[in-house]
Design a protein with these regions (language model features):
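Membrane-interface helix-loop junction between the first two transmembrane segments
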Residues: 24-42
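A membrane-cytosol interface segment of integral membrane proteins
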Residues: 233-257
């Protein structure tokens, strides 16, 4: 891996370049033609994405681990002594993805957790940025579970940043409006073909395709929905949902109707 002194610069450049490439591909090979780049809620989602998502959390934890190591507070377990940074990254990605699959399923079953999660499904357009729309509580829960093991297991500090970079780029990809065909890879690796159905509001697609990075969880546990000759027609909730971050935050606490 790249030295820890330049890891933030490299990952920042990689995310920006990935975003530009995905946006260009959305315009050249759109799944839903005519979908605008600056659609409803774009700037709000961009702020959420920039300030609150996994990459920024990864940088914070990167420096936290380095600081804790500098003052002598280290985990008794040192996974970095047994695995290279790349091996650590793969282990954490697979284990965290397995957790996310089951937690995601629970979010769709639990009335309380759905209130927190429904903001993620509120966008009527699914594109490279819509995946960033998440309630603050969901972000805190997921990123605590995501990054705490890195410190508890004594991971290399840069692994947190690379993990955040992977999450950011993959999140942009699976939500992108690109008419991509992954072929047999879609049975193992998640892509836009399956994940856009997760955001579709057609009844037959509800509570399907919970995987984030590894589509194999859906195929293994019977939640895969992948109609090859159908097109996802519309997305979002069937009710009006607020667009601003503040309104979305407090909407969770509304009285039950």
């Amino acid at each position: 891996m790249i030295s820890t002194n330049s890891v933030e610069f490299f990952t920042s450049i990689f995310i920006v370049c990935s975003a530009v490439i995905i946006i260009v591909l959305e315009q050249i090979f759109p799944y839903n033609k005519g979908q605008k780049i600056f659609r409803r809620g774009f700037f709000n989602d961009f702020v959420l994405y920039t300030l609150l998502q996994s990459y920024i959390a990864g940088i914070c934890i990167f420096y936290s681990i380095r600081w804790l190591q500098a003052i002598g507070l280290q985990s008794d377990v040192h996974i970095s002594s047994y695995l290279s940074p790349w091996q650590q990254l793969i282990v954490f990605i697979v284990v965290h993805d397995f957790y996310i699959y089951w937690f995601h399923r629970l979010q769709h079953k639990s009335r309380f957790l759905w209130r927190i999660h429904e903001v993620h499904h509120s966008s009527f357009e699914v594109d490279w940025l819509s995946g960033s729309r998440s309630h603050l509580f969901e972000i805190l829960i997921n990123q605590t579970v995501e990054f705490a093991p890195l410190f508890l297991l004594g991971a290399s500090p840069e692994v947190a940043v690379y993990k955040g970079m992977t999450d950011a780029v993959w999140g942009m990809y699976i939500h992108s409006n690109i008419n991509v065909k992954s072929g047999f890879l879609q049975y193992f690796i998640n892509g836009p073909e399956m994940h856009r159905w997760h955001h579709a509001n057609q009844k037959k697609a509800l509570d399907k395709n919970f995987s984030t990075k590894l589509a194999m969880w859906d195929w293994l546990f019977g939640t895969a929905y992948f109609p090859k000759n159908e097109k996802a027609g519309s997305y979002g909730l069937t009710k009006v949902y607020p667009l601003s971050f503040i309104q979305q935050f407090f909407y969770v606490f509304r009285s039950r109707s």
